[in-house]
Amino acid sequence: MPQKVRIALDAMGGDVGASVVIPGAAISLNRHPDTEFLLYGNGALIEAQLAAHPAMKAVSRVIHTDVAVGMDDKPSQALRRGRKTSSMWLAIDAVKKGEADVAVSAGNTGALMAMARFNLRTLPGIDRPAIAAVWPTLRGDSVVLDLGATIGGDAHHLAALAIMGSAMARVLFDLERPTVGLLNIGVEEVKGGEEIREAAELLRSLNLPQLDFIGFVEGDGIGRGAADVIVTEGFSGNIALKAAEGTARQIAEYLRSAMSRTLLSRIGYLFARGAFNALRGKMDPRKSNGGVFLGLNGIVVKSHGGTDAEGFAYAVDVGYDMVRYDLLTKINQTLNRHGHTLAPASAVQEALS
């Protein structure tokens, strides 16, 4: 395990770029002083931000490039124009070369996935990477995947997601045998499509010591924390993620409107301010920022493109944790034992936009 965690940052990624990336990384550095940074992007813009963060500057190396992947670029365009020259590619390439332990970017999701997969390649037994993230629930946190890396997938693909997600849960939640559920339209064994029923049978037959497969979980089970790990293919996973984010914003707006409607409600808010602040903190999407690309020969973390510095700091924190607690080793240990059962999926369409 490295004495220092070396993090490569795509300083040009996201809606704003360096003015969020550098302050965000500085916040994370305060929490994890055993961190060093490689900063890829426009050197002048990066140095201007570093001037306000001397502690960050002291542990950073700036690698200049004028090429940045646009948020609207198609993955094929990003690969064609930005391969080997863009800030996004160079950050990923630093992981491949062993110069960094993890790459973090707030850039274009499709381009980041395409570049990461093209450069790092997938692990043995893994046909498609997945995006996994921590999801706040009523009983704590869960790992949910896939949140949009691929569309569709057969039973072997879903079983591979379960293995990788359980490894992430063991790392983050310090669990010996995380519970794993497959997202479905019902909990009965006869519910759902053929692929998900076959995945359930495969996971039961494997009886892996690293995870406790509990069967199917319905949509409301995500928020209830019905399992430590909830597995689905990327189409439904991304819909679930966006629906949850929208619901959180809707509830926050309802509360804000209700608490400011009358003088009496404003007075009531003053008495309940502590409870409302706790609720706001629990629902803050910034604290769940940072989707991990699982299934690659290296660790890549995707931040929301429109986040602020505090939100980006949480994405950097996720990358730090994945390295410090040796996520790749834990995934590989399981795949080495059971990878022969996870033959590549035959019909999985990659989501590149």
From Swiss-Prot:
Its EC number is 2.3.1.274. The gene is plsX. It comes from Nitrobacter winogradskyi (strain ATCC 25391 / DSM 10237 / CIP 104748 / NCIMB 11846 / Nb-255). Coiled coil: none annotated. It catalyses: a fatty acyl-[ACP] + phosphate = an acyl phosphate + holo-[ACP]. SUPFAM superfamilies: Isocitrate/Isopropylmalate dehydrogenase-like. Transmembrane segments: none annotated. GO terms for molecular function: phosphate:acyl-[acyl carrier protein] acyltransferase activity. Its main location: cytoplasm. This is Phosphate acyltransferase. Pathway: Lipid metabolism; phospholipid metabolism. InterPro entries: FA_synthesis, Phospholipid_synth_PlsX-like. Belongs to the PlsX family. One of its GO terms (cellular component) is cytoplasm. It is found in: Cytoplasm. GO terms for biological process: fatty acid biosynthetic process; phospholipid biosynthetic process. It holds the Pfam family FA_synthesis. Keywords: Cytoplasm, Lipid biosynthesis, Lipid metabolism, Phospholipid biosynthesis, Phospholipid metabolism, Transferase.
